[in-house]
A protein has these predicted regions:
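Residue-level recognition of single "structural anchor" positions
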Residues: 1-266
Length: 266
């Protein structure tokens, strides 16, 4: 944000204020538009980042850093629509928040795939009961010769598909699309780069930046395979949104009371 303030010669406080207003407007856009989603296959995953400092340094850091922060997403495998996002820790409570929100946004029964994170089990049961075809894709990892301190994951040596509830179709038990979206998110926002000094300093601003990204990804970005935006593919909008429309929406909200927004920390 400081680079933007230097380029356009305005105060960093002005840029920060715009980020907050944009985040709140985009959060409300998602909340209002992404409802009664007709989907057949949903994939869920969570991606790591940090705010202030990494978790191992929180105890000795100055100020009140948040430490590790996880962004959970549920994506429609067919339209690539991000149905539900949530920002929090990696606990069961965050999984419950994601699944409860996902349930409320769906119009029909779906096939659901997650990774093997145990927090999903109780969360899916609590949100959907038996009204879901749910499976976990569990990856198995082998030893790696890479020394300690590496930033790449261990080598995946195999996968196991485990039915949890209902009758999931094994050939559609996958997390490939949500993992690819995680990569797009990490490459689109420098806050998410692993080795960076551009990490978020406040969790609220972290969430506002994510809300802006989700609005761009969902409503204004043409997916290369779909040839339309995910929102258009899902039938929740009838046109490709422009950034000018997003900006006008921000201006229209400036005089109105702010809502709780799209995503919240656990």
């Amino acid at each position: 944000m400081r680079s933007i303030s230097r380029v356009v010669d305005v105060s960093i406080n002005t840029v920060t204020k715009l980020l907050v207003e944009a985040g709140e407007a985009c959060a409300n856009l998602h909340d209002a538009q992404v409802q009664d989603v007709k989907a057949s296959k949903i994939q869920c995953d969570e991606i790591w980042s940090f705010v202030g400092t990494k978790q191992k340094n929180v105890a000795t850091a100055k100020g009140e850093p948040e430490g590790d922060v996880w962004t959970w997403t549920a994506i429609d495998a067919d339209t690539k629509l991000i149905v539900s996002p949530f920002v929090g820790d990696r606990s069961g409570q965050s999984a419950i928040a994601l699944m409860d929100d996902l349930r409320d946004r769906l119009a029909n029964r779906v096939q659901l795939t997650t990774d093997g994170h145990k927090a999903y089990l109780e969360a899916v049961e609590g949100a959907f009961g038996g009204d879901v075809d749910y499976a976990q894709l569990i990856k198995m990892y082998g030893p790696t010769p890479t020394p300690a301190g590496r930033y790449s994951p261990a080598e995946c040596t195999g996968i196991k598909k485990v039915r949890v509830e209902g009758d999931p179709d094994r050939k559609h038990v996958s997390t490939s699309y949500v993992e690819r979206q995680n990569l797009t998110m990490r490459m689109s926002m420098r806050r998410f780069t692993r080795l960076t000094n551009a990490f978020s300093k406040k969790v609220d601003n972290h969430m506002h930046a994510l809300s802006l990204y989700f609005a761009f990804y969902t409503f204004t970005r043409i997916h290369k395979t779909l040839k339309v935006s995910p929102a258009k593919a899902a039938g929740i909008t009838d046109h490709l949104w422009s950034m000018e429309e997003i900006a006008e929406m921000i201006e229209a909200r400036q005089a109105k009371p702010m809502s709780a927004g799209l995503i919240s920390s656990g």
